[in-house]
UniProtKB/Swiss-Prot annotation:
HAMAP family named among the record's database cross-references: Asp_carb_tr (MF_00001)
The UniProt record lists the keyword Transferase: yes
Pathway info: Pyrimidine metabolism; UMP biosynthesis via de novo pathway; (S)-dihydroorotate from bicarbonate: step 2/3
GO molecular function list: amino acid binding; aspartate carbamoyltransferase activity
Catalytic reactions on record: carbamoyl phosphate + L-aspartate = N-carbamoyl-L-aspartate + phosphate + H(+)
The EC number(s) this enzyme carries: 2.1.3.2
Any GO BP: 'de novo' UMP biosynthetic process
Keyword Transferase among UniProt keywords: yes
Binding site for carbamoyl phosphate: 57-58, 107, 135, 138, 268-269
Keywords associated with the record: Pyrimidine biosynthesis, Transferase
Protein name, per record: Aspartate carbamoyltransferase catalytic subunit
Similarity-based family: Belongs to the aspartate/ornithine carbamoyltransferase superfamily. ATCase family.
Binding, L-aspartate: 86, 168, 229
């Protein structure tokens, strides 16, 4: 497939071969980075980062990825410093920013915002998260992290823990994992279960799924535990949030019942769902996961820019 100019909006737009291709390119770029420190593929190209919602890892890893490719970055980390405050529409913002850039990365609280941006823009658009909908680049780096840790994805038993209702990272990841021969444990409070339409789609695609509230019962079965925080900002009602706040914590006591090879992942930021004592254990994979964002986003930027 021709990647030059392609938008990256939803993991649903990817085939398994697309995913595997991105992971291979990312692996090659990681090796080149270790050898050379920085590359020149995107020299003369400009990335615009439009972050209408807070971000640390996604924004900085995209910026780092572009710099590592030899390109430049412009953008904003808060809509409060832009003409959006004056009432400018998203479409007009996109049409303006594309005059200055070769590729746009956007994070926005509105579901479908990235798709709208892609329809308006003539340069490629990459979705860095749209509300509780999709976060495709996080999914790709998650798959990359798993594959680097285990040498495979097929045959693994993976638990998704926490806010499965509002968490866009687990929505995208679950849909991507359906391409592989995996078994999924969906572990959450009743109020935060994975949306029914996603569960039904996964089952239709042949994924073996267990839905449970019991983390202790599930932990011995897992190869990967993917932890998410309870997304306070997505709750329409503070009382509903307080009902589920602090539902789970992953700590060393819990992990005594896990496989020695279990890896704990988290898209971060965390609040209290993983105790800091886990950080020094062999189970912790979440900071390696952070690193994975750079080669994976380098691959996506380079491919959509047509320089790889």
């Amino acid at each position: 497939m021709d990647w030059n100019g392609r938008d990256v909006i939803s993991i649903r737009d990817f085939s398994k071969s697309d995913i595997e291709f991105v992971l291979k390119v990312a692996e090659r770029l990681e090796e080149e980075l270790r050898e050379k420190g920085s590359l020149e593929y995107a020299r003369g190209k400009i990335l615009a980062t439009l972050f209408f919602e807070p971000s640390t890892r996604t924004r900085l890893s995209f910026e780092s990825a572009m710099h590592r490719l030899g390109g430049s970055v412009i953008g904003f980390s808060s809509a409060s410093s832009t003409s959006v405050r004056k009432g400018e529409s998203l479409a007009d913002t996109i049409r303006t920013v594309e005059q200055y850039s070769d590729v746009i990365v956007i994070r926005h609280p509105m579901e479908g915002a990235a798709r709208l941006a892609a329809e308006v823009a003539e340069v490629p658009v990459i979705n860095a998260g749209d509300g509780s909908n999709q976060h495709p680049t996080q999914t790709l780096l998650d798959l990359y992290t798993i594959k680097r840790a285990f040498g495979k994805i097929d045959g693994l038993t993976i638990g998704l823990l926490g806010d499965l209702k509002y968490g866009r990272t687990v929505h995208s990841l679950a849909e991507a994992l359906a391409f592989y021969d995996v078994e999924l444990y969906l572990i959450s409070p009743e109020l935060l279960r994975m949306p029914k339409h996603i569960v039904e789609e996964l089952r239709e695609r042949g994924v073996k799924i267990h839905e449970t509230t019991d983390l202790e019962g599930a932990i011995p079965e897992l190869d990967v535990l993917y932890v998410t925080r309870i997304q306070r900002e997505r709750f329409p009602d503070e009382e509903e949030y307080l009902k589920v706040k602090g539902s789970y914590q992953v700590n060393c006591k819990l992990l005594k019942n896990a496989k020695e090879t279990l890896k704990v992942m988290h898209p971060l930021p965390r609040v209290d769902e993983i105790h800091p004592e886990v950080d020094k254990s062999e189970h912790a994979l979440y900071f390696r996961q952070v690193f994975s964002g750079v080669p994976v986003r380098m691959a996506l930027l380079g491919l959509t820019l047509g320089v790889l």
